[in-house]
Amino acid sequence: STPIKSSAASDVYKRQGFIMAKKELQVSAIENGTVIDHIPADKLFDVINVLGITGMDNAMTFGANLKSSKLGKKAIIKIWDKFLEDDEVNKLALVAPSAKINIIRDYDVVEKKTVNVPEKVEGIVKCMNPKCITNHEKVRTKFTVVKDSPIVLKCHYCEKLTDQEHMEMN
């Protein structure tokens, strides 16, 4: 990260509760919650949107364009006092299949999860076929994952294929 040279800027960071050490901003550890790591840098805002976390009252930290040996650049999300439900993990897997989830309790990582693309996807993704029954009636969408890297889904009703690039979440 770029060192902050202005003492005025440094004072602002100190007043806002950040700790300055070795010319880097240190983000505090979370006591309880979820850390989503290894998000491709260009998928950060997709993950934020698909998980609907902008509407939460929980404290959150987002890091973008961080160095990563695996991804080149990555993003990270820390959410205090929030643990992802199965459907949220499935949504995450569709948007950022390389993501890793760390469950934090009492400041310790108590569980590490690798995100896996599910075999079946229900009620999460919209069918791209405008003639599909799911776009005209109150029918829950159902897809089979045909390919998981890059992700390709097949609609249960009309058999239309949808790739990851064109996926639209419900």
Regions found by a protein language model. Give the residues of each.
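Single conserved hydrophobic/aromatic residue that forms the stacking wall/gate
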Residues: 1-16
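Cys/His-clustered metal-coordination modules, chiefly Zn-binding fingers
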Residues: 109-170
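Residue-level signal for beta-strand positions within conserved beta-sheet cores that form or flank
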Residues: 5, 58, 151
